[in-house]
Amino acid sequence: GGYARVGENLEVTGNEAMREYELLEGDLSVGDMVRFEKYGYPGDPLRAHGIAFEDIRFASPMGEFAAWQVDGTDDTWVVLVHGKGASRGEALRMLSVIEDAGLPSLTITYRNDDGAPEDPSGYYQYGLTEWNDLEAAAQYALAEGASDLIIVGYSMGGGIVTNFLYQSALVDRVAGVIFDSPMLDLGATVDLGGQNRNLPGFLTTVAKTISGFRFDIDWAALDYLSNVEEITVPVLLF
């Protein structure tokens, strides 16, 4: 088996396209069964970029969680938070830039990740509870010598980071945040999904109402944009 990356279209003929192809690891042959993922790099920091790292565990109220720790020469640490259904591999695209800058980093897991403790509800809470795990990771970084933190959130990780900024007493240790396609209003995201599927608006509203009762979803609490003026740290948004 192997891991390869495909890029831009080089040639398109009818229903066929020839794309850039780069083998990053192992060996792949014509006819091999493959699957696609969006991360663009294999495995872990060492496999992806040759970056030495330690697989550490930090303690949260829900239990112990795994994280990749990469050392650096600076005392500002970067904490990276992946999105829903993703993994720490989502951060590999940015990790080499962080390492080149000399910044230590911590790429974390949180409740309901594979191998991690589950949320008491059994479901993702889109930042309502996961921010506690981010806070625990921040406490770990500060205990290890971080003077301040830059926090990166991908997709649902952006919601986790935002609620951390609203809820955590450690917000004054945050030098800045980076959002990569953050999901900051779950209700609006569901509405857009319905529009993209040409569903009548009232059907989406009914579905949200039913799911709110069925899964105890507080749609208003998941609108992190409603009090965005409370965020006082610098934000870089992609």
Model-predicted regions and their roles:
Residues 163-221:
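Hydrolase active-site cap/lid region
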